[in-house]
Amino acid sequence: KEFGVESTDIFLPDCFGFGWTLPTIAAHCSLIGFSSQKLDWRVHPFFGKSKHPFTIGVWKGIDGSSIMLAHGYGYGKRWNDVDLSENKELMELAERTPLKTVYRYYGTGDIGGSPTIGSVRSVEKGVKGNGPLQIISATSDQLFKDYQPYKEHPELPMYDGELLMDVHGTGCYTSQAAMKLYNRQNELLGDAAERAAVGAEWLNLADYPGTFLTDAWKRFIYHQFHDDLTGTSIPRAYEFSWNDELISLSQFSDVLT
């Protein structure tokens, strides 16, 4: 269920702002949609009285390419065994958009974990319910697929610009640039080491160093955490992070040499 599945959307509930290049890069990677809930963390409104341009619509990138954008309304929502087809909060959220549609995250956000039993039962009751709301339990990209192609849906509002934060992680595209450099070097060197190791074993020149490579991968991937690689941790933390990144670079280099 986890492997061999191709993603068609960008699912970033808890990242720190989104550049104007994101829809362009996503569209050229054949992705069709993007969702987050982070913009509600803004201190000040950016679009009139709202913190985001719309809840569901189309986001245009710097070259005119576009993807669909949906606002997830918080990542820690829980319900306690209720019929969501009659949920007043969802009704109110639906009224905020001309589409009369709500894209809603739920589960145990931030600290991690699956949705509670009560939340799952609520969704199941909502799907089978007879209230005024039609509840659809779906993958994160289903809404985007339902509106394909976007050009045939003029009712979708469009935004052309950046979606930046004004607090909590602002500037993380450039903060701790060394971490970003080391991470990318490890990704490239790790890939090269894997290919070389497989080729060497196929030619009966050397045994595949599976344990060694796994250790190298895990050591630097561990730091692809959104308060580490992004550059939002305290300075002291990066003394440990840099060390791990450099050890992995050395390990991958050893495989190649």
Language-model region placement:
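Catalytic-domain carbohydrate-binding cleft regions of carbohydrate-active enzymes
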Residues: 1-257
